[in-house]
């Protein structure tokens, strides 16, 4: 029973780190990346569709993204969606493809992005700690109900803390790599 609680908390912590990495992929670092466009949705055919399902997104150069829609009639809608995504880029529509030059980041913008990355990472750390707290609360409830012993509760608390420390260390490592990526471009 307590193993199920531990496993559940471990999975939630793992998902938190995965979500952090996905969110970091959305931060523009001055280098072209197709991940910047993963969350963009385009209004077409009466519904909102992910951009990557409507077009081929390629990176021919370090600071250039080319979006080649499978249906050329969607060029204007895709261009509009990219502008609305607030990525601080200006798409150029040549009638066949959309080219997006990724401008180099200014020093101020780099600092802002690094600050934003720290905030995102801190939110992930808080989330991991909350998962630990919930797991410990659940274990205490099991002990109170007589389903586990006090020794098992102490062992579970230690396991939750160990998992928390490991996932926070991973969050810190991911943050450090992202900050380095932001500051070196």
UniProtKB/Swiss-Prot annotation:
One of its GO terms (biological process) is translational termination. GO terms for cellular component: cytoplasm. InterPro entries: Ribosome_recyc_fac (IPR002661), Ribosome_recyc_fac_dom (IPR023584), RRF_sf (IPR036191). Keywords: Cytoplasm, Protein biosynthesis. GO terms for molecular function: ribosomal large subunit binding. The keyword DNA-binding does not apply. It is found in: Cytoplasm. Responsible for the release of ribosomes from messenger RNA at the termination of protein biosynthesis. May increase the efficiency of translation by recycling ribosomes from one round of translation to another. This is Ribosome-recycling factor.
